[in-house]
Amino acid sequence: MVNFEKNINELQEKLISVNRVSKTVKGGRIFSFTALTVVGDCQGKIGFGYGKSKEVPLAIQKAMDKARKNMIIIPIVCKTLQHEINGYHTGSRVFMKPASEGTGIIAGGAMRAVLEVAGVHNVLAKVYGSTNPINVVRATVNALKKMRFPMHIAEKRGKSIDDILG
């Protein structure tokens, strides 16, 4: 993971990875760069972007723009998750569960960056299968999209919140 952080308009931006890729043509190879970034407001709003260009700064800028356009809202209370969640994308599977206050973010690589910009401070997480950063970010975002407030679940089932929480 590349160490790159920026705060613009209360959004925290993190660069997860930059790769050099090549296209082979008759005259040789054409090199270009890809960048994967995540953007969040540390209060439950998060987005990720993937940009590609012939130069690194342009690839990063494209990725940041895409991340700002594709933001979603996730329910976070007390700086942790509501319940255990699983997510997957292609060969990557992620498992996350809430942790008590003071635990911190126990997660690796790309998943850590996503959880930090989302505003989650206490979580236990694990990646199974492929650790490709793009797939891990997509799996993490898919898992976070599935999370629901206990109040909404209780309403849907026609029960009280106490019944849902056990």
Curated annotation (Swiss-Prot):
GO terms for molecular function: rRNA binding; structural constituent of ribosome. The gene is rpsE. Keywords: Ribonucleoprotein, Ribosomal protein, RNA-binding, rRNA-binding. The N-terminal domain interacts with the head of the 30S subunit; the C-terminal domain interacts with the body and contacts protein S4. The interaction surface between S4 and S5 is involved in control of translational fidelity. The keyword rRNA-binding applies. Belongs to the universal ribosomal protein uS5 family. InterPro entries: Ribosomal_Su5_D2-typ_SF, Ribosomal_uS5, Ribosomal_uS5_bac-type, Ribosomal_uS5_C, Ribosomal_uS5_N, Ribosomal_uS5_N_CS, Ribsml_uS5_D2-typ_fold_subgr. This is Small ribosomal subunit protein uS5. It comes from Wigglesworthia glossinidia brevipalpis.
